[in-house]
Amino acid sequence: MRNQLYLMADDIAQTARETFPGAQTHLIGGDSRERHDIIEDNSVDLSFTSPPYLNNYDYADRTRLETYFWGEAKSWSDITKKVRNKLIMSATTQAIRSGFDKDHAMSDELCSVAPCVAKMLQNKVSQLVALRMVKGGKKSYDLMVAGYFNDMLPVLREAYRVLKPGAAFVLIMGDSAPYGVHIPTDIYLGEIGVAIGFTRYEIEDLRVRGGKWKNNPQRHSVILKESILTLFKN
């Protein structure tokens, strides 16, 4: 997996050399939720990413072929320790119920920075807590939703720190509706971004999602979408 990452970095570097002679690329391995002092304040012209979609997709499991092949993992628990536990929360397979306070699911930091959003999210989590008790499978969507936004807050904060005034943070993402409870991910993250310090945000809808499941009787009826969220820093 590490070799593949370096191959991708080489491709980017080659493209940069051919398109922008003299340009340099630097690969920084790290967690986007953490501060990286190598990137100075107000030094970045553009930040562009697509964070995990809040759709219970186990991104860690998608590394199974590579981690097994390279001998970095031999079991589900190995992948959990080495990959799954390190990712931004986006799947119920990452959720740990022990110690979870369903009435205070949102982090203290999120409640302090964006109390209105935190209150709306707490309401969504409470709905999911109740639905979990009557639904088959008892999926931990409540933990998933709370964990996702708690994890994304420091990502937004760090992006704001490193971006230059006048720069933008662009995110491609999808909304979610676990157990039919709609989570407008782009709006919530946009509002959190403004609470952090971004001046404003714009949302551009790209496409409708989930159409292939429309004939599934167990599927919710919420129409989902993929969108571009752009946060502007002045």
What does each model-identified segment do?
Residues L54-R157:
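SAM-dependent methyltransferase catalytic-core segment centered on the flexible catalytic loop
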Residues T199-R209:
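Conserved S-adenosyl-L-methionine
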Residues S176-H182, L189, Y201, S221:
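C-terminal target-recognition/interaction regions appended to catalytic cores
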Residues M1-F48, L54, D58-D61, M120-S126, ...:
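SAM-dependent nucleic-acid methyltransferase catalytic core
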Residues K164, Q218-N234:
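Core SAM-dependent methyltransferase catalytic element
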Residues V155, P184-G197:
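Short alpha-helix
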Residues L153-P165, G193:
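A short glycine-rich, Lys/Arg-flanked "PGG" loop and its adjoining helix->strand segment in the class I
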